[in-house]
Design a protein with these regions (language model features):
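N-terminal, intrinsically disordered, polar/charged segments of Gram-positive cell-envelope systems
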Residues: 9-65, 198-213
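Conserved polar/disulfide-associated segments of primarily extracytoplasmic proteins
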Residues: 75-211
Length: 214
């Protein structure tokens, strides 16, 4: 792992999910209209896409994944997702997750209304996470949140309020784990949390009125 330290708004008008964007906690398996009760979708189509560099200014982090690791993602062997504490409360944590998908999970189609997404997500095997946690959060709590057993502290956020961690599962497949450990991470200036509370939109989304807007 290479580590160095350098100093959006969700649409309320539509529950539609665009291919290539992660599903927010508000959207996971949920549909507000009765007519959507039986709506189904393929979760693997909505994992985060590979990029040359990921810049999360509300987390105060940017990182680059290895080319081989990105190939695993492009081949749908690894799902990149996100998670954060409730957006209507004080931010306690926010992180990106990296998970192994089986062939069955890659092909799976789930029902939005019946908690299908949560069941699918919980069935994935966690490789590791990158994110921030409120200062003085115990490693025991971080382990519970991230589903990881090994935590490397990258540093402290620029506002001094959060600890930044790179977390992994020590017993995971060595080839995938070693590639994940090649991730290059930097701490950058952390922007103030947006009014809508969602901190997992990237730099390219910041000028838009909603995250992931095309």
């Amino acid at each position: 792992m290479s580590l160095s330290t350098v100093g959006c708004k969700k649409s309320n008008e539509s529950n539609k999910i665009k291919e290539g964007q992660s599903i927010s906690s508000k959207e996971k398996g949920m549909s507000t209209k009765e007519k959507d009760k039986n709506e189904t979708f393929k979760p693997s189509d909505y994992t985060l896409k590979t990029k040359k560099e990921y810049v999360y200014e509300y987390l105060g982090l940017k990182f680059k994944l290895s080319n081989k690791f990105k190939k695993y993602m492009n081949d749908k062997k690894i799902a990149m997702l996100d998670d954060q504490s409730p957006i209507d409360k004080e931010l306690k944590y926010a992180f990106l997750t990296f998970n192994k998908m089986t062939k069955e999970q890659k092909k799976a189609v789930v029902n939005k209304k019946e908690g299908g997404y949560e069941k699918w997500e919980n069935g994935l095997k966690r490789i590791g996470t990158i994110g921030i946690f409120e200062k003085n959060t115990s490693e025991e709590k971080i382990s519970k949140l991230t589903k990881c057993d090994t935590h490397t502290k990258i540093g402290v956020s620029s506002d001094g309020k959060y600890d930044c961690y790179f977390s992994t599962n020590s017993g995971f497949e060595i080839n995938l784990l070693n590639e994940f450990k090649k991730t290059e991470i930097q701490i950058i200036e952390k922007k103030e949390r947006p009014k809508n509370g969602f901190v997992l939109s990237e730099k390219t989304d910041l000028e838009n009125t909603e995250a992931f807007k095309k």
